[in-house]
Amino acid sequence: MDFLLALVLVSSLYLQAAAEFDGRWPRQIVSSIGLCRYGGRIDCCWGWARQSWGQCQPVCQPRCKHGECIGPNKCKCHPGYAGKTCNQDLNECGLKPRPCKHRCMNTYGSYKCYCLNGYMLMPDGSCSSALTCSMANCQYGCDVVKGQIRCQCPSPGLQLAPDGRTCVDVDECATGRASCPRFRQCVNTFGSYICKCHKGFDLMYIGGKYQCHDIDECSLGQYQCSSFARCYNIRGSYKCKCKEGYQGDGLTCVYIPKVMIEPSGPIHVPKGNGTILKGDTGNNNWIPDVGSTWWPPKTPYIPPIITNRPTSKPTTRPTPKPTPIPTPPPPPPLPTELRTPLPPTTPERPTTGLTTIAPAASTPPGGITVDNRVQTDPQKPRGDVFIPRQPSNDLFEIFEIERGVSADDEAKDDPGVLVHSCNFDHGLCGWIREKDNDLHWEPIRDPAGGQYLTVSAAKAPGGKAARLVLPLGRLMHSGDLCLSFRHKVTGLHSGTLQVFVRKHGAHGAALWGRNGGHGWRQTQITLRGADIKSVVFKGEKRRGHTGEIGLDDVSLKKGHCSEER
């Protein structure tokens, strides 16, 4: 009876405990499959990711190169490798106890054992005494093949020397046996080789693999530009460019002094063809257009001829001969005295002086002494002034004079020189933005200093384009031209940048184009043909494209480009 009562009591307590259990999971699940409870749901723990079949797998960033991921950012390396991401070779020969009995040579991901002279390597890796190998005296041991002794080398990068006993290195880089990825150079080592990034590049883990990435020396401060220059990063290196108002190679920049030449006063031009030169003393020199004026072939000095009347009167000088060809600017004048000519006479060629013909009404009787001697050594000051076109020992050859020749105009006469250059810091330099396009080229401040052009963002759906045109004008018949420019087409869906040339009112297919990249790049293109009317840069963007198209440092030179890139 007592036993039955005890059994009933135990049964009631069990049923009460079972009724209180609601079947819910605990707050945290300690499991080897990476499951955790987050409030009322169960999901993969932090550092784990759910696979397509529903199981949670650990995630390692970066990935394990020679191993497997066993936990969040935790790699288990394969034999022969070490490191956090299993990307380093394990030197088994340095382990204790040593894996080899005699000689050990480490290889990438493994190792090899070799026996001393007089021993042979057995199949189990041990070394056994061999009188035959001892007699051969091999550097790295020997092997018996069909009863013959043959010395062996431990690596494919080693080969037997002519003596048949020692091993010499094989230069895989020179023989072409090496195979290095792009942008890496081969460096030979004893028994092997390594692939190393070129100068200006650094090995980085990008996109799930190791790549040679360009080093931005400008942003890192690893450049040697002048303090008056800007640093521009290019692929594998950098370049220095002097700032506005300075000149030089970028490593050394020298200030360019500003020179301004202003006229001393207003110049009155009388009726008729001719030119008036006004000096500092206020005396006007009227130079008529007379085709019969001659200048002696070699007259180093013109002797002064002074009239009896000292009052100020205009004097005449030879007729200028205009020419469209630009020349260097004028030299500082030396004292020269000319005399007011007599009424018109028949022109003759004197031996020691100058004879001119001018209208009688322009010069009254009498004359004055005017210091108009010209220095024979030509100089080249800048500015829009009257300058000699052909400087020589003959002073001015028949007074061939033109106005408005600058250093830029003079450079256009010489082949292979710069004929146009623009960095857009102070405007478009002759480039024209076509207004009928959907988009426009706009100047934007460069963080490194100055400005560059960029294509505005598209605001309507469909294809959009912005065109920048440079009319060549007189350069249209200059032959081949070298177009050089810096550009960048960066970002997600950045668009397209293209180069065209227009001939006979229309342009053909694009000569060059780019729709992606990283950072600024330098490009040179040879524009072939003598009938090019204009050069066109076309930038295309669509709505929603977040990338940037940039253009800067555009220049044109005569002739072919030294390097197409």
UniProtKB/Swiss-Prot annotation:
Any single Pfam family the record assigns to this protein: EGF_3
Disulfide partners: C56-C69, C60-C75, C77-C86, C93-C104, C100-C113, C115-C127, C173-C186, C180-C195, C197-C212, C218-C231, C225-C240, C242-C253
Compartments it resides in: Secreted, Extracellular space, Extracellular matrix
Origin: domain of life: Eukaryota
Keywords: Calcium, Cell adhesion, Developmental protein, Differentiation, Disulfide bond, EGF-like domain, Extracellular matrix, Repeat, Secreted, Signal
Comp. bias intervals (Low complexity): 304-316
Tissue specificity comment: Expressed in kidney and lung and to a lower extent in brain, pregnant uterus, placenta, thyroid gland and blood vessels.
Domain notes: The MAM domain is required for localization at the cell surface.
Description of how the protein assembles with itself and partners: Homodimer and homotrimer.
Name of the protein in question: Nephronectin
Organism lineage: Eukaryota, Metazoa, Chordata, Craniata, Vertebrata
Gene name linked to the record: NPNT
